[in-house]
Curated annotation (Swiss-Prot):
Gene3D superfamilies cross-referenced by the UniProt entry: Glutaredoxin
Annotated PANTHER family: THIOREDOXIN-LIKE PROTEIN HCF164, CHLOROPLASTIC
Segments forming domain Thioredoxin: 34-143
Principal location listed in the UniProt entry: membrane
Protein name stated in the entry: Thiol:disulfide interchange protein TxlA homolog
ATP-binding as UniProt keyword: no
Signal peptide start-end: none
Record-annotated disulphide pairs: C64-C67
Membrane-spanning residues: 10-26
Subcellular location: Cell membrane
Amino acid sequence: MTPAKIRNALLAVVAIALSAAVYLGFQTQTQGISLEAQAQRAIPLATALDNGRPTLVEFYADWCTSCQAMAPDLAELKKNYGGSVNFAMLNVDNNKWLPEVLRYRVDGIPHFVYLDDTGTAIAESIGEQPLRVLEQNITALVAHEPIPYANVTGQTSVVENRTIEADPTSPRSHGNPRPS
């Protein structure tokens, strides 16, 4: 074998090894913090509204890139504040949550609604929020203080404006009512 062929073979092996390492790294990173996994472990909204603790309601969708980007930060917040704050997650693609989508006027996601310990909405923020902002808001929520970053808007994934067809179980209706 010539030196050029040896070099090319080594480069090919290194490229394959690096590609595999990067792929496995991303798979490992996202498995523990996926939106689906967090949603399955989230407090049901009915429980959150009745247990006397303040609540952060997150409206999300699995396809929402902003929601996916925030998943690690929210997992950290849930770990640190889960004993004093309910974390409820409502998927906008599930028509079950249509009343809540309409009540809180969700038209972009992620959409966060801060509820006091009586279940009253006291603030909201829409779009990607830095961990520091979310943490300060949650700290204020627990302390019964004004939410410092209320009504802040960051980058969002738009909830598509679609009408509800005759079959209300359509997963892509996004809860928008049929125009009159």
